[in-house]
Structures are given as C-alpha cells and as structure tokens.
Design a protein with these regions (language model features):
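SAM-dependent nucleic-acid methyltransferase catalytic core
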Residues: 2-70, 74-84, 99, 110, ...
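Short, well-ordered beta-strand micro-motif
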Residues: 2, 155-158
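Conserved acidic-Pro-Pro-aromatic motif
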Residues: 65-145, 149-155
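Flexible, glycine-/basic-rich loop-and-beta segments that form/coincide
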Residues: 160-163
C-alpha cells in the first residue's frame, strides 16, 4: 500500500536486478491509509486463501468449469521505447505471451469464461485469433508527451460480449 500510494502514478516496476525503481510522487496530500477500508478488507481476507505461486501453476491447479478468469499480463510493448514488461526481474517476453496463449486455450477447453487484456500488436492478435477480440481506444496516464497518452488495447474473450 505504501509503494502504491507514494510512487509516481502508483506504478510498480523493477530493474534488471529485481529492485524496485519507481520515483516518489510529488503529491503532498497522499493518504496512506483508509482505516475503514483496511478493516473491511482484513475481514474479507480472513476467509481467503492467499497463494504465492506462478500464475500458470495457480490456474492449472485451481481453475474449474464456469470460473470467470480475468488475465491482465504485462502488455507486449508496441514500440522499442514502450516498456510494460518490467514487473519482475525475469520480465515478461513474447515467449511468455505464447505460453499464456496456450494456457488460455486449455482454460477455454476446460469450460472457463476468460477475459484477457493486452496491447494491440500483430503478435498478440495472432496468438488469440481463434477468440473474440475487441479493440478499444485507451488513455495512458504515463507519457512524457501529453499528445501520446492515447493508444489502442484489446480485450480477448472466449464468449460473446456487448463491448
């Protein structure tokens, strides 16, 4: 909570050594805690099983028919200067996206309802071309040039939507 509230735009990112490397925010009116919300969350978490495992292990072990699963992986960069994969020391590369696409198909065959978001790139479109893909105009909060704070993302589902 501290990192989310005190860092630039609530961003989480690491360097190649796996060290957190986001600058502090300039906002002096940061509210670190919301006691009421923390107490409600604490109460809910008492009934929750928390796991510290790779996403693929969790999904292979626990996903079952009719589960609704939302996947929001680090986005595949749309250019050499965009970098949305540095959330872990190992990063998340195209091969990781290919493995995720295979798992998406396995979960589909299992009867899960799936929603995945990602960048609108030819590679990602090809990986999920068997499924329903919607392209959405998006706004970015982080870009040094204000006129470049827009883009296109995709939502992939294995069921029909009205998006």
């Amino acid at each position: 909570i501290f990192l989310n509230r005190t860092c630039f735009n609530g961003l989480y990112r690491v360097n190649k050594k796996g060290e957190f490397n986001v600058p502090f925010a300039d906002n002096k009116s940061i509210k670190l805690t919301d006691e009421s919300n923390l107490l409600k969350t604490s109460k809910l978490l008492k009934k929750t099983k928390l796991l510290s495992l790779s996403y693929d292990l969790v999904l292979k072990k626990y996903a079952k028919k009719n589960d609704l699963i939302f996947l929001d992986p680090p986005y595949l960069p749309v250019s050499k200067f965009s970098d949305f994969k540095r959330y872990t020391k190992e990063q998340f590369h195209l091969d990781d996206h290919k493995k995720l696409a295979i798992l998406y198909e396995e979960l589909d065959k299992k009867g899960c309802y799936l929603i995945l978001t990602n960048s609108n790139t030819p590679e990602i479109l090809k990986l999920y071309n068997k499924f329903n893909i919607k392209i959405l105009n998006t706004k970015r909060n982080i870009n040094s040039k204000g006129n470049l704070r827009t883009g296109k993302d995709i939502i992939v589902t294995n069921y029909e939507t009205n998006i």
